[in-house]
Amino acid sequence: MIEVGSLLRMWGNHSRWIALDIIADQVLVVSQKRNNKVWLNKSAFEVIG
């Protein structure tokens, strides 16, 4: 289950993200590598920490 502050890995390219906010089936995430923020669907991620 994704919660604010969760460390996430994107399915497919395995990039790492941190969850900042959650609304319905969308999650605001920030990339650890490039520091960019974007709203994406929760199903694009798996929780790794």
Predicted features along the sequence, with ranges:
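Basic/aromatic-rich interaction segments and small domains that mediate binding to polyanionic partners
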Residues: 4-49
